[in-house]
Amino acid sequence: MKRILSIQSHVVFGCAGNSAAVFPMRRMGMEVWPINTVQFSNHTQYQQGWKGIAMPAGHISELVDGLSAIEATQVCDAVLSGYLGSAAQGQEIVTAVNKIKQDNPNAIYFCDPVMGHPEKGCIVAPEVETFFKESALSSADIIAPNLLELESLTGMTINTLDQVIEANNQLLEKGVKMVVVKHLSRAGIQKDRFEMLLTTEDGSYHVSRPLYDFDAKRQPVGAGDLISGVMLANLMAGYSPIDAFERTNAAVDSVMQETFNRGAYELQLIASQERFNAPEIIVKAEKVA
């Protein structure tokens, strides 16, 4: 059994951050240790607003110190990070990653650099964006940006698939071993599909799934967090990057289809749980570079 430390946001109601990623990873056989960067009543796209707080400075470090004291850091196989409440939390995560890799040299760091949405813009403070560009990249083994986040990480303006591939290769040159672009958006080649791109030293692979016609004001939140969690769990289960990519695409499609069919605003993880371990792979990844 693989052990994953998951450091990201938490919502009491609904599915975002750890609330979107922890259950699927556990359902896939992972032992998951969640640490919350913020704790909100619900995700922030509700028109009625939300309540909650960012965890205080030192919170992450204190908990990781506790894990170290009981020697849990020695058996941690991966760290997954997502939404940050502050840049200081990011530095605490990097410190935690370094400690875990020191205790277990085989551990990996999967960074989901949550900054915003290609159609909605950046939602984090400038110092958080700077942290991802200047600190997270040097520590991450795997990074999973959307198009907006990829532009931020590379400083490129990206409008085509070739430019996405160029940007991904730029990240590989900085030491990242795998890039998973969770949403190609306008840079995609199939405007009626939801497209993703995987890049490793072996090349770049494109995959897509149906783009469901959710109401613009009722677009489910948390799909990116779900993608990162399921992708990491598949990799930890021993699947190759390409197989993990295909399985993740299929599993997430099942969740989105179930959510759409039920007319729900929150991801229907419970109703879709059988597909996390047994995804119906209809679309195979295609090598594009």
UniProtKB/Swiss-Prot annotation:
Task: List, alphabetically, the InterPro entries matched.
Answer: PM/HMP-P_kinase-1, PyrdxlKinase, Pyridoxal_kinase_PdxY, Ribokinase-like
Q: Where does ATP bind?
A: 112, 144, 149, 182
GO cellular component annotations of the record: cytosol
Q: Which cofactor does it need?
A: Mg(2+)
GO MF: ATP binding; magnesium ion binding; pyridoxal kinase activity
Q: Where does substrate bind?
A: 9, 44-45, 225
**GO biological process terms held by the UniProt record:** pyridoxal 5'-phosphate salvage
Record bears the keyword Transferase? yes
What is this enzyme's catalytic activity, as reactions? pyridoxal + ATP = pyridoxal 5'-phosphate + ADP + H(+)
> Which EC class heads this enzyme's classification?
transferase
* EC identifiers of the protein: 2.7.1.35
Q: Which UniProt keywords apply?
A: ATP-binding, Kinase, Magnesium, Nucleotide-binding, Transferase
Q: Name one Pfam family in it.
A: Phos_pyr_kin
Q: Fetch the CDD domains from UniProt.
A: pyridoxal_pyridoxamine_kinase
The family note in this entry says: Belongs to the pyridoxine kinase family. PdxY subfamily.
| Record note on quaternary structure | Homodimer.
Protein's UniProt name: Pyridoxal kinase PdxY
Species of the source = Aliivibrio fischeri (strain ATCC 700601 / ES114)
Classification from the root reads: Bacteria, Pseudomonadati, Pseudomonadota, Gammaproteobacteria, Vibrionales
